[in-house]
Structures are given as structure tokens and as C-alpha cells.
């Protein structure tokens, strides 16, 4: 009998959490998803493809502490058959999932991504991991962070849609190196370092930064200070449907992530995998799992985080089309082998099915 799960997420839907939609859709299509509970509302942005299919199953829990939200969830489920509860992040969603599972008398599991693991005190996270039926880690960096004696941690990376993000012809050259960066305008994305790097370049360059966030004014001021208003453009939020065209515009994609002043960092940002799937070279920082994946893929240079000079040197190295061609091919081949969405989501579904249906050994990656 197929296991039936209630899943607790954070805000839903959110532009920055495309991976959640793909995995939830896979659970729903496998007839494993009872309901999706969000601990708060989403970001109000244009939803990703597939979100509409999820909306009939979505409930936004009333504001309150974790115990109150868990109680509301249990009441809403009523007599529905639930074989397990999965928290999609290690902080509040996992806490609510654990409490609701206890009330329902079933097991719980949770996923861990990046900042969510660092929002929970180390001792509390370790206890939660040991109490869970299993933990799903989406990259090696965070897997190591949550691996403790007695915990069952499984590395199951998110995938990328290889049909949506595919190689397209490069733009006609106008003599400029076209650089794209995508992400929320927050400190950990390292976009201020990227702007500083572009200011150092001795080759003609056009930089587009796609996203919105609290750092907008600071980044705009940096662009003005460097005299780059004709070189760097903050293009705002891009929908999931617009992103393939953005990658097609670019000669390469920069992912200059840093560890921010609060200790937050990216794990393995979607943009890096989408860029590789699109056949574009990647220039990335050596942060968390990002540098290791790009080195393994041979899809572009890896530079120290926050080092504008090193980033400028890497961009200059890729100014010639001949220097970029093989990197884009290598990146596409790598994501086809390791991050195909259908394969990755199937592994997550099989893992959760095995875990919550009482199989002795959960399916590993």
C-alpha cells in the first residue's frame, strides 16, 4: 500500500524554491500527498509551473507557535489516512511536522537545505535528526552539518528541468562579454563583489542582475559609484518562464555567493544547475557545495568568495568565445548525468515511500 504523507513547508509558493514544487508534484502524482501545510503565506510572485496543480492540497496554517500550528494541522486532517509527516525544512516546518506526527501516532522526516539548518541550535538539530525516521539532505555541505550519531541522513539532490533549461544558440557578438547573475538581492548572493569585479575589467562587458531584495539600493549605489550605469542593469524579478531567455542572452553566468555577516550561505543554488543545463559556463565562489559541484562538472572557474580581483580575472579569462565553448558542453553533460529532474524527484519519492511504508531500508541516492 502506497504511503500517504502530509508535508509541511515554509511560505508557499516562493519564487526562490522551485525545487519544492517539483518534488511536491512528484509526490502528488504518485498519490502519496494528502495535503501541503504552509507555516506562512508565499511571496506573492508569479508562481512556477505546476503550482496551480498543488493549490487544492494547500492549507496555510494560522499564525502561532509550532505547537499551535501542529494542532491546527491535526484538526484539519481529521480522519484522513496519514502514514507519515515530512517537514520540508529543518527549522519551523520540521518542528511542526514532528509535533503533528506525535499527535497522529506516525513517524516524521524532514529535508535540510542550507540556512534552515543554521537557524536551529546545534543540539536541537541533532536531537531532531535522531528522532526522525530519516533526513533528506540536498547537498554534501548540509549533509555533513546534520550528520550526527544515530541519525539517518540521505543525500538526495534537487534536480533541474532539462527540457525547460536547454542549450540555445549564443547571442550574436557585439564585442561585449554578456554576464548574467540571478538571485535575491541579499548579502549572501555576493552581487556587490560581482559589481566590484566588473568595475575592474579591461574588456567590454554587460552585466544583468535579475532579482529583487533588500540590497537593491546598495547595489544601485555601487553601480553609480563605479560609473557602470551603462554596463550593469538591475532587471528585477524574473518569472520562471522568462529565465530560459535570460540564460540564452548570456555568454556566461556568475554565481558569486559569500557567507554573509549572519553566517548564512547558499548550499547549491538552482541558478548554477540551470546555467549548466542551458549550456552556459559558470563562474562561481567556493562556498558550501557550489565550488565542489562546478569543479566536478568542469563547467567554469571557481574563485574565493568575496574576492573581486579573482572574480575579475576569471571573467576576463572567459571573454574569448573559444575559452567558453567546452565549459558549456561539460556543464550540460554533468547535469544530464547527475541532476536530471525526473531522476532526482523519483529518488525523493522512492525514499519517502520506503521510509514511511515501513520498509527496512530507505532507498538511498
Spell out what each predicted region is:
Residues 220-242:
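Nucleotide-activated donor-binding/catalytic signature segment of Leloir-type glycosyltransferases, i.e.
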Residues 1-60, 364:
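N-terminal subdomain of nucleotide-sugar transferases
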Residues 120-123, 160-176:
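Acidic anion/phosphate-binding donor-loop and adjacent secondary structure
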Amino acid at each position: 500500500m502506497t504511503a500517504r504523507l502530509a508535508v509541511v513547508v515554509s511560505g508557499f509558493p516562493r519564487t526562490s524554491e522551485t525545487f519544492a514544487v517539483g518534488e511536491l508534484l512528484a509526490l502528488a502524482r504518485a498519490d502519496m500527498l494528502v495535503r501541503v501545510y504552509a507555516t506562512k503565506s508565499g511571496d506573492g510572485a508569479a508562481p512556477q509551473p505546476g503550482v496551480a496543480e498543488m493549490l487544492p492540497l494547500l492549507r496555510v496554517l494560522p499564525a502561532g507557535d509550532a505547537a499551535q500550528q501542529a494542532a491546527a494541522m491535526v484538526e484539519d486532517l481529521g480522519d484522513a489516512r496519514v502514514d507519515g509527516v515530512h517537514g520540508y525544512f529543518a527549522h519551523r516546518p520540521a518542528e511542526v511536522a514532528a509535533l503533528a506526527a506525535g499527535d497522529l501516532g506516525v513517524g516524521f522526516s524532514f529535508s535540510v537545505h542550507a540556512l534552515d539548518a543554521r537557524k536551529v541550535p546545534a543540539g536541537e538539530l541533532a536531537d531532531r535528526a535522531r528522532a526522525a525516521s530519516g533526513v533528506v539532505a540536498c547537498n554534501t555541505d548540509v549533509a555533513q552539518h546534520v550528520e550526527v550519531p544515530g541519525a539517518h541522513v540521505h543525500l538526495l539532490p534537487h534536480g533541474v528541468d532539462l527540457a525547460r533549461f536547454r542549450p540555445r544558440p549564443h547571442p550574436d557578438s557585439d564585442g561585449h562579454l554578456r554576464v548574467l547573475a540571478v538571485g535575491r538581492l541579499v548579502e549572501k548572493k555576493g552581487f556587490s563583489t560581482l559589481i566590484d569585479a566588473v568595475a575592474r575589467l579591461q574588456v567590454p562587458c554587460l552585466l544583468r542582475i535579475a532579482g529583487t531584495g533588500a540590497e537593491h539600493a546598495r547595489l544601485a549605489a555601487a553601480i553609480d559609484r563605479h560609473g557602470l550605469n551603462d554596463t550593469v542593469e538591475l532587471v528585477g524579478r524574473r518569472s520562471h518562464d522568462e529565465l530560459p531567455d535570460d540564460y540564452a542572452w548570456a555568454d556566461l553566468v556568475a554565481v558569486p555567493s559569500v557567507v554573509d555577516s549572519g553566517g548564512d550561505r547558499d548550499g547549491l543554488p538552482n541558478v548554477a544547475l540551470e546555467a549548466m543545463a542551458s549550456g552556459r559556463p559558470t563562474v562561481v565562489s567556493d562556498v558550501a557545495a557550489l565550488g565542489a559541484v562546478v569543479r566536478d562538472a568542469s563547467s567554469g572557474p571557481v574563485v574565493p568568495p568575496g574576492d573581486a580581483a579573482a572574480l575579475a580575472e576569471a571573467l576576463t579569462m572567459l571573454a574569448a568565445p573559444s575559452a567558453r565553448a567546452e565549459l558549456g558542453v561539460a556543464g550540460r553533460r554533468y547535469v544530464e548525468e547527475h541532476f536530471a529532474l525526473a531522476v532526482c524527484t523519483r529518488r525523493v519519492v522512492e525514499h519517502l515511500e520506503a521510509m514511511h511504508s515501513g520498509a527496512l531500508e530507505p532507498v538511498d541516492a
